Swiss-Prot record:
One of its GO terms (molecular function) is tRNA binding. Residues 254-273 are annotated as: Disordered. Coiled coil: none annotated. This is Ribonuclease PH. Phosphorolytic 3'-5' exoribonuclease that plays an important role in tRNA 3'-end maturation. Removes nucleotide residues following the 3'-CCA terminus of tRNAs; can also add nucleotides to the ends of RNA molecules by using nucleoside diphosphates as substrates, but this may not be physiologically important. Probably plays a role in initiation of 16S rRNA degradation (leading to ribosome degradation) during starvation. InterPro entries: ExoRNase_PH_dom1, ExoRNase_PH_dom2, ExoRNase_PH_dom2_sf, PNPase/RNase_PH_dom_sf, Ribosomal_Su5_D2-typ_SF, RNase_PH, RNase_PH_bac-type, RNase_PH_CS. It catalyses: tRNA(n+1) + phosphate = tRNA(n) + a ribonucleoside 5'-diphosphate. Keywords: Nucleotidyltransferase, RNA-binding, rRNA processing, Transferase, tRNA processing, tRNA-binding. The gene is rph.
């Protein structure tokens, strides 16, 4: 039993609330336990210089944490005059993960800018950002299609991410900050709805780990991603059916009609997984 009462294979409660920001083309508040991230998607009718004239779009991301998202205040990076290495690493991860499931040619010469702002951190901020940003992105692209600017939703698959680790000698899913700080092995998995790997970030924090441990951790992480993808699909409702690959595995998620301001939640251990 973990400190918060979960079993090793259980996730924290997850809640996704769409249309959280009234101004953005797509927006989500994602809550994973006590971690909360606001994800917004903004469309611009231009592309970076290296893409001009190629007829393709681009997706980029920015990531940041509010000063009191953490236990002690962290100075704003703008006040320090530069971004930290961790911030740059995470926002590049978010951008390339989202690009992996989009038909950029079908987007046309447009840029989708994703902003992920952590308002409260308790572990898993980068994975929560990817999972929430995906939903915000789909909503923004659906608006583009509704305006007649593209003829179809250029989304090839679902996308979600979660963390796993070895804590106290036990493989566990969806680490809190406290668990992450004690983990002997720490791994993040970004995966599509059809089960293809987009990115694996794994580190032996205190010791090397075996291939068998790696395979066990990946299987555990995949089970978490599948639950998150099922939650995304439920939240997107009819729009989710249009995504290229549809996850058919039962999610065990209590149904709530998606819509403006509606949130859908995933309880820990939902669906008996």
């Amino acid at each position: 039993m973990r400190q918060d009462g979960r079993l090793p294979h259980e996730m924290r409660p997850v809640r996704i609330t769409r249309h959280y920001n009234i101004h953005a083309e797509g927006s989500v508040l994602i809550e994973v336990g006590r971690t909360r991230v606001i994800c917004t998607a903004t469309l611009e009718d231009r592309v970076p210089p290296f893409l001009r004239g190629r007829g393709e779009g681009w997706i980029t991301a920015e990531y940041g944490m509010l000063p009191r998202a953490t236990g002690q205040r962290t100075a704003r990076e703008a006040a320090r005059g530069r971004q930290g290495g961790r911030t740059m690493e995470i926002q590049r991860l978010i951008g390339r993960a989202l690009r992996s499931v989009i038909d950029l040619a079908a987007l046309g010469e447009r840029t989708l800018i994703i902003d992920c702002d952590v308002i409260q951190a308790d572990g898993g901020t980068r994975t929560a950002s990817i999972t929430g940003a995906y939903v915000a992105m789909v909503d923004a692209l659906a608006g583009l299609r509704a305006a007649g600017l593209i003829d179809r939703l250029p989304v090839k698959d679902y996308l979600a991410a979660t963390s796993v680790g070895v804590v106290g000698g036990v493989p566990v899913l969806d680490l809190t900050y406290e668990e992450d700080s004690r983990a002997a092995v720490d791994l993040n998995l970004v995966m599509t709805g059809s089960g293809e790997v987009v990115e694996i970030q794994g580190t032996g924090e205190e010791r090397p780990f075996t291939r068998r441990e790696l395979e066990e951790l990946l299987a555990l992480a995949e089970s978490g991603v599948r639950r998150l993808v099922a939650l995304q699909r439920e939240q997107l409702g009819p729009l989710g059916v249009e995504v290229g690959a549809v996850v058919t595995e039962a999610s065990g998620i209590g149904h709530q009609e998606p819509g403006e301001g509606a949130g859908v939640s995933l309880a820990p251990g939902g669906g008996g997984l």
